[in-house]
């Protein structure tokens, strides 16, 4: 599996610290029955911990190279890896209007747009 290089034009900075990824995933567990949407999974470092729990996880990634990598790394998650631009998504359609937890190692370039 060929690693993906971060693309500066997308503001990518991949999470590589496994302990930080585990801590983020553990923080999401405060809402164990609510599905999770991960923004910008990159190479799936956080994703690998999110999918350990018995809950629905979806990941949205704009970079087609990262999407292909994620398909290979997480074949069972393939239908839940969304190759889209998060900022243009209709979030009501992601989980059919249900409440969900938003997490991720957000691309710096869009972090303010995500939260505001």
Task: Name each model-derived stretch.
Residues 1-116:
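Catalytic cores of RNA-modifying enzymes
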């Amino acid at each position: 599996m060929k690693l993906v290089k971060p693309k500066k034009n997308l503001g990518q900075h991949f999470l590589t610290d496994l302990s930080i990824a585990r801590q983020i995933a553990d923080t999401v567990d405060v809402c164990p029955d609510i599905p999770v949407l991960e923004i910008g999974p990159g190479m799936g470092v956080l994703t690998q911990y999110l999918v350990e729990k018995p809950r629905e996880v979806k990941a949205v990634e704009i970079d087609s190279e990262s999407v292909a990598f994620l398909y290979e790394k997480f074949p069972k998650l393939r239908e839940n890896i969304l190759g889209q631009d998060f900022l243009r998504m209709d979030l009501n359609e992601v989980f059919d209007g249900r409440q969900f937890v938003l997490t991720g190692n957000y691309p710096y370039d869009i972090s303010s747009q995500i939260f505001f």
